[in-house]
Each structure stands twice: as structure tokens, then as C-alpha cells.
């Protein structure tokens, strides 16, 4: 049986641009793409923490070190510059692979600099 697990995420990224008339996609700083284990043209989910919007798009590369998170095309209507978003990618694997798999979790500061990286999320307590 195949199951779908979180492969990687950029947590609390700040939207730096919203370009309605650019080809649809999400441009992400190449360094952040690599840290999260994303691939160019990979499908991603965007969860807008500020307004609750959730949508799919795909990754395109922005300049390394730029901190760019740009929602383009129709996705630009789902955000405002400065919104905080979670960008997630998922992968399918069998249960044996899932037992050994660790996601790439990248936590960002407001300026999209890396606060920390990890591969676990602590157990939620009351």
C-alpha cells in the first residue's frame, strides 16, 4: 500500500511579492528550495496563515539568497505581500519506506532567513 507523507515544508515564510500577470507558480529562493527538499516544477500546497486560504501551485526558482517567496498568476489573488504562509510538499511511499523516512522541515524568520531546520515535530501537549 502507498501512503502520502509530508516530504518537506517551509514554515511561516513571508510573501515578498504577488505578481498577477506572471506565469502561474510560486517562485522560491533556490537555497530554501534545496533546504526543504523541493524540486523545480514540483506541486506544492500553500497554507496562508493570515487569511486561511489553501491552494496548490508549483515551484519555480528565485535567485539564491534573495529570500524571495513570490505568488504568481492566480495564486497572487490568494495572498498579500507580508502574509505568512506554510509551503508543503508531499510524497508517496510504501509503509516500509515511511518507517524510515524523515521530512525536511525549515522554520523561517519574518525576513525568510532560516531560524532552524529539523526532521521532527514535537508531540502536541494540552
UniProtKB/Swiss-Prot annotation:
InterPro entries listed in its UniProt record: Asp_de-COase-like_dom_sf (IPR009010), Asp_decarbox (IPR003190)
EC numbers, comma separated: 4.1.1.11
Residues bound to substrate: 57, 73-75
GO terms for cellular component: cytosol
Needed co-factor(s): pyruvate
Cofactor, how bound (note): Binds 1 pyruvoyl group covalently per subunit.
BP GO terms, sorted: alanine biosynthetic process; pantothenate biosynthetic process
Annotated active site: 25 (schiff-base intermediate with substrate), 58 (proton donor)
Enzyme class, first EC level, given as a word: lyase
Main location: cytoplasm
Pfam families attached to this UniProt entry: Asp_decarbox
Keyword annotations of the record: Autocatalytic cleavage, Cytoplasm, Decarboxylase, Lyase, Pantothenate biosynthesis, Pyruvate, Schiff base, Zymogen
GO molecular function, one term: aspartate 1-decarboxylase activity
PTM info: Is synthesized initially as an inactive proenzyme, which is activated by self-cleavage at a specific serine bond to produce a beta-subunit with a hydroxyl group at its C-terminus and an alpha-subunit with a pyruvoyl group at its N-terminus.
Lyase as UniProt keyword: yes
Cell compartments where the protein resides: Cytoplasm
Pathway info: Cofactor biosynthesis; (R)-pantothenate biosynthesis; beta-alanine from L-aspartate: step 1/1
Known role: Catalyzes the pyruvoyl-dependent decarboxylation of aspartate to produce beta-alanine.
Subunit structure: Heterooctamer of four alpha and four beta subunits.
Identification of the protein by name: Aspartate 1-decarboxylase
Species this chain originates from: Marinomonas sp. (strain MWYL1)
Record lineage: Bacteria, Pseudomonadati, Pseudomonadota, Gammaproteobacteria, Oceanospirillales
Amino acid at each position: 500500500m502507498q501512503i502520502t507523507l509530508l516530504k518537506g515544508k517551509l514554515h511561516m515564510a513571508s510573501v515578498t511579492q504577488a505578481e498577477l500577470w506572471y506565469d502561474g507558480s510560486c517562485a522560491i529562493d533556490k537555497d530554501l528550495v534545496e533546504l526543504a527538499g523541493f524540486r523545480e516544477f514540483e506541486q506544492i500546497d500553500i497554507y496562508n496563515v493570515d487569511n486561511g486560504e489553501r491552494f496548490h501551485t508549483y515551484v519555480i526558482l528565485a535567485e539564491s539568497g534573495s529570500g524571495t517567496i513570490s505568488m504568481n498568476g492566480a495564486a497572487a489573488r490568494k495572498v498579500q505581500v507580508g502574509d505568512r504562509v506554510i509551503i508543503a510538499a508531499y510524497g508517496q511511499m510504501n509503509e516500509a519506506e515511511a518507517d524510515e523516512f524523515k521530512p525536511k522541515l525549515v522554520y523561517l524568520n519574518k525576513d525568510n532567513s532560516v531560524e532552524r531546520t529539523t526532521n521532527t515535530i514535537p508531540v502536541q501537549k494540552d
